[in-house]
Swiss-Prot record:
InterPro entries: Ribosomal_bL17, Ribosomal_bL17_CS, Ribosomal_bL17_sf. It comes from Chlorobaculum parvum (strain DSM 263 / NCIMB 8327). Pfam families: Ribosomal_L17 (PF01196). Keywords: Ribonucleoprotein, Ribosomal protein. PANTHER family: LARGE RIBOSOMAL SUBUNIT PROTEIN BL17M, RIBOSOMAL PROTEIN L17. Gene3D superfamilies: Ribosomal protein L17 (3.90.1030.10). Residues 127-154 are annotated as: Disordered. GO terms for molecular function: structural constituent of ribosome. GO terms for biological process: translation. It comes from the Bacteria. PROSITE patterns: RIBOSOMAL_L17. Part of the 50S ribosomal subunit. Contacts protein L32. The gene is rplQ. This is Large ribosomal subunit protein bL17. Belongs to the bacterial ribosomal protein bL17 family.
Amino acid sequence: MRKVKPARKLGRTTAHRKATLSNLSTQLLIHKRIETTEAKAKETRKVVEKIITKARKGTHHAQREIFSALRNKEAVQELFEEIVGRIGSRNGGYTRIIKLAPRFGDAAKMAVIELVDFAEAPAAASTAAKQDRAKRVKGSKKAETEKEGGESAE
């Protein structure tokens, strides 16, 4: 006998769950990367993958169907103008989920969901953050050498 595996309910009523997933999908399409709980990220991935696949058709009917799901003109416009152009040749797998450390307040499993072709280089961002931190930390060797170098240049 066929058993249907239910989707995650996320502790919400049906209408609230649909609204939550619609909002998360809209924000992902606009910002290309969002941080949320792991369960919400996995459910959002299902919705966004179907939306992008539908958008690749490029028809007016597909645009109307996507707007009925998202209810945000900015997100639909971004999807059809920018995202489909960059993802056009990819057959599925448009999103990536990266697991993060648990949230401090309630230890919920956290994750980042992002569009694959829009991922920024995380190494460059972390290097810049380390340099900024070294400048702020008092007594660090980097901060002292920069301070000495800066004073002699004046």
